[in-house]
Each structure stands twice: as C-alpha cells, then as structure tokens.
Amino acid sequence: MVLTLRGTPFLYFGDEIGMVEVPVTRDDVRDPAGELGTQPGRDPGRTPMQWNAGPGAGFTREGVRPWLPIGDARANNVEDQRRDPGSVLRLCRDLIALRRETSDLRSGAYSSLPSPPGAWSWRRGPCDDRRRQSLRTGGSRCRVGPGTIAIGTDRSRDGETFDGDLSLGPWEGAVLRVARA
C-alpha cells in the first residue's frame, strides 16, 4: 500500500522480505528505552537482516553472537526470496518499478472511491486516469468497472482481466488498470 500512496515511501530493513519482530528476552534488551523497563523498547524490530538460511543468517559468521537475536532465517530470507517469483521481495521490487514508471503513483492526486465494508479503494492521478488501487480486509466484492490487474499481492492474478466485479481474497491487494468508460 505504501508504494501506491503519495509521498516518499519508507521501508525499514526487513520490510521488503516480510521480516517479523523477533522476541527479545530481558537479558538481550539493548534499547535504552527498553532497559528502563518502562516500555518494551524497539529491539524486536531492529534484529539482524536475514540474508540467507545459513548459520548467522548471512549477517554474521557462525558462532558469533550478534547484538540482538536473529529471527527464523530458514523460513524467511533474502536469498530464497530472490528465487521465488511469488515472494514479498519480488512484489516489493515490482511495485517500486511500477511506481518509478508511473508518475501518478509518485505525485498524482489521491481520491477515495466508494468501497464495500472490508475494502478500501482509491484512485491516483487526474480524474480521467484509470489506475486504481484496492485493498481488501474483508470478504466483499468490489464493483470497479472492467479492467486488468497490473500487480497484485496474489501474483498468479497479475494480468487477469475482470468485467466489472472484482473479488479479492482476504488481505489481498491489487493495482488495477481500469478500462475507460
């Protein structure tokens, strides 16, 4: 979503592969705010990048204990996602490329579109532009007009055409090219 909205997108390291926060034990806390014990601290979101599934996750050598614990790099790492066309990394790179190619995604006006409960749809660009984004958080269908899925979170649907009603799965998002009326 952040790559389809106006402004400068910000990805914190690990976002591009879907890294999740790593539990940090009290003894491993390094964040000064967390050391005070008044708040959990920021360490769970600052753990080492998971570059590969090997020892140290490609961040450090085997046997070296990093500043903060490493997450499950076997389940989620850059090396594996580079080879997977359906990965979060590939989706992120493709959305960045689409944003680079499409001025409306970088600086076009935002307008909210009518959306059923559990969905959010918006348009970027001039009023006559037909590029729309939809994000579904529920189970309803969206009426958007005939068009094509340019890029979606379900990569098997990229290029899929629809005749007016678009169904998105739970938590599915898509950048759409809608045919002119």
Regions found by a protein language model. Give the residues of each.
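A short acidic, often aromatic-flanked loop/helix-cap motif at beta-alpha or helix-coil junctions
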Residues: G56-A57, R155-D158, G173
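C-terminal beta-strand-rich structural cap/linker in extracellular carbohydrate-active enzymes
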Residues: E160-A181
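Beta-strand-rich binding/interaction modules
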Residues: T137-S156
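Low-complexity, intrinsically disordered short peptide segments enriched in small/polar/basic residues
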Residues: I17, R26, P146-T148, G159, ...
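Loop/helix patches that line or flank the sugar-binding groove of alpha-linked glycan CAZymes
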Residues: M1-D128, S134-G139
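A conserved amphipathic helix/loop scaffold
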Residues: R131-R132, D158-E160
